[in-house]
From Swiss-Prot:
It comes from Chlorobium chlorochromatii (strain CaD3). Belongs to the universal ribosomal protein uS15 family. GO terms for molecular function: rRNA binding; structural constituent of ribosome. This is Small ribosomal subunit protein uS15. It comes from the Bacteria. The gene is rpsO. GO terms for cellular component: cytosolic small ribosomal subunit. One of the primary rRNA binding proteins, it binds directly to 16S rRNA where it helps nucleate assembly of the platform of the 30S subunit by binding and bridging several RNA helices of the 16S rRNA. Forms an intersubunit bridge (bridge B4) with the 23S rRNA of the 50S subunit in the ribosome. It holds the Pfam family Ribosomal_S15.
Length: 89
């Protein structure tokens, strides 16, 4: 359910500039997206797990805030992240 260290490092390498670049908005959005997809698959198997559903909604809200920030600061980086993660059509 949670991300392993290897999975995190792989995502950070893909979206960050270095292996320790975890603060970049693109990296944060990618990590949240991976956690959201994991929680979504968990909730499909366990539909009555209300605590995980709340956690999912909180993660979606955090990702949305970061995406709004990124859209206001640098629209090109925003479009690139949206395209790579296939978040919007």
């Amino acid at each position: 359910m949670s991300l392993t260290q290897d999975q995190k490092v792989e995502i950070i390498k893909q979206f960050g500039t270095s292996e320790k670049d975890t603060g970049k908005s693109e990296v944060q959005v990618a990590l949240y997206t991976r956690r959201i997809s994991d929680l979504t698959s968990h909730l499909q198997e366990h539909p009555k797990d209300k605590h995980s559903r709340r956690g999912l909604l909180m993660l979606v809200a955090k990702r949305k805030k970061i995406l709004n920030y990124l859209k206001n600061v640098d629209i090109e980086r925003y479009r690139k992240v949206i395209g790579e993660l296939e978040l919007r059509k």
